[in-house]
Regions:
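Short linear motifs at protein or domain termini
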Residues: 1-102, 106-109, 113
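Short, flexible helix-adjacent loops and helix caps
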Residues: 16, 20, 61, 112-116, ...
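Short loop-to-helix capping motifs
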Residues: 28-29, 175-177, 225-227
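All-alpha effector-binding/dimerization core of bacterial HTH-type transcriptional repressors
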Residues: 75-173, 206, 210-223
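C-terminal all-alpha effector/ligand-binding and dimerization domain
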Residues: 124, 128, 187-247
Length: 247
């Protein structure tokens, strides 16, 4: 085992036992090196790995924000790893598509369930259910994204960015942080194959019009609390585009 891997294992163990909590700073490089009996370059390499994984954020200097701070960015490491594997050819586009279908059909159903739960009880929902403000905010944000995508002057690249944001938002609405992190991590790979496929379409305008309608159908099902229909709509949406592009 390389020295920096021993440092990583020790930091992982300390995080697991709660020695360092979210938002706290790790000891200074010199202090960590002395505590673990390793060189400062080994500590430095371990911190770089942790930063790439989205576990810590580093800042230079001597102020209160200097050093390595424990953060919550799980999608950072996942996204970088997935993008590199897709680029190297070790992950096929079909693998990404199938993973999307698994994640997003589940998320669509779970999001619809949250919508129903948030409606609460009593006359006209007088007693809101759990997470009602967050659910209402997410639905409003999703509608706003789709409204922006209706702009006929929108460039294809901007459309795709809004499209990706809409899908990540729906997964966030499902309320599972880990699934959201995986989906966010997949975003770069998804945008890559969508851009590649879009370039081969005979008519982007026609496809964009269909995608707009499909997005509206997915959101309508989620808003209505119909999880089964939402899952069917999102599956047809994802697989339909993949089939159309012939990737």
């Amino acid at each position: 085992v390389r020295t920096h891997e021993r440092v990583l294992a020790r930091i992982e163990a300390d995080l697991a036992t709660g020695r360092w909590a979210l938002g706290e700073r790790l000891p200074a490089e010199r202090a960590l090196a002395e505590e673990l009996g390793v060189s400062r370059p080994s500590v430095r390499e371990a911190i770089r790995v942790l930063e790439a994984m989205g576990i810590v954020r580093t800042a230079v200097g001597s102020g209160p924000d200097a050093g390595a701070t424990v953060v919550d960015r799980p999608a950072a490491g996942l996204g970088a790893a997935v993008r590199l594997h897709v680029a190297s050819g070790t992950l096929a586009v079909r693998d990404v598509v199938e993973t999307r279908v698994l994640l997003e059909t589940w998320a669509a159903g779970a999001a619809a369930e949250r919508v129903v739960a948030a409606q609460g009880t009593g006359e006209r929902g007088a007693d809101p259910g759990p997470g009602a403000p967050e659910v209402a905010e997410a639905l409003a944000a999703a509608r706003a994204l789709l409204d922006r995508m209706d702009d006929p002057a929108l460039a294809a690249e901007e459309f795709r960015e809004l499209d990706a944001s809409f899908h990540v938002l729906l997964v966030r609405l499902a309320g599972n942080p880990l699934v959201e992190a995986v989906m966010t991590g997949l975003r770069g790979a998804i945008e890559s194959y969508v851009a590649q496929g879009s370039a081969a379409l005979p008519s982007w305008e026609r496809t964009a019009a269909r995608l707009r309608a499909e997005h509206r159908a997915v959101l309508a099902a989620v808003t209505a609390g119909d999880g089964d229909r939402a899952a069917r709509e999102v599956r047809a949406h994802i697989e339909g585009f993949y089939a159309e592009t012939g990737l």
